[in-house]
Amino acid sequence: MDYTIIDAHAHLWLRQDTVVDGFPIRTLDNGRSLFMGEIRQMVPPFMMDGVNSAEVFLSNMDYAQVAAAVITQEFIDGIQNEYLAEVISRYPDRFFVCGMCEFRKPGFLAQAKELIARGFKAIKIPAQRLLLTEGRVMLNSEEMMQMFRYMEERDVMLSIDLADGATQVPEMQEVIQECPRLRIAIGH
């Protein structure tokens, strides 16, 4: 049987250095990171500097006969757009890369437009992280809907992870109704 293998969910980063829900996330050594109050093995220990680079990932993809990978993002990785723009330009046939905006505060529409102009073919929203203690960022807010319409007009995919349960389902129903041609991939 002849088929192509695609890794549908992978992450790349140069360094983890962020704060999520009040917890720091930092690259340590030997592939470990301080992660939400615990030390976790984020990459194999031979990746001593904690860098999860495209080159190491490609080496593993080649070994496993994986043709291409979808590179997603999450706030826990830190926003990696600068590095991932380089990955897009260096390996356009191996990686389908999602850009990510700072959705936890206003102004992300301009960020999304810039990412799309830089060649990102998808925008990732880790929507489960938008249930903030200071108030929810609604998926059907005016700025979100403007962004979704902009993406739909340019055939840019939405990659989104939703909160557990049905909390954000009515908002997504509205997005789908308003933007029926918007391609949407819902992750875990």
Place the predicted regions along the sequence by residue.
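An N-terminally biased module of ancient metal coordination in phosphate/nucleic-acid-related enzymes
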Residues: 1-70
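Conserved, mostly hydrophobic/aromatic
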Residues: 9, 61, 84, 115, ...
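Hydrophobic faces of well-ordered beta-strands that scaffold small-molecule active sites
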Residues: 6-10, 69-72, 95-99, 121-125, ...
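Acidic-and-aromatic substrate-binding clefts and catalytic sites of carbohydrate-active enzymes
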Residues: 47-51, 73-80, 102-109, 130-139, ...
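A general structural detector for well-ordered alpha-helical segments in enzyme core domains, enriched
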Residues: 56-60, 80-87, 111-115, 143-147, ...
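Catalytic pocket-lining loop regions of alpha/beta-barrel enzymes
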Residues: 122, 137-188
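Short, well-structured secondary-structure segments
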Residues: 60, 65-80, 85, 92-102, ...
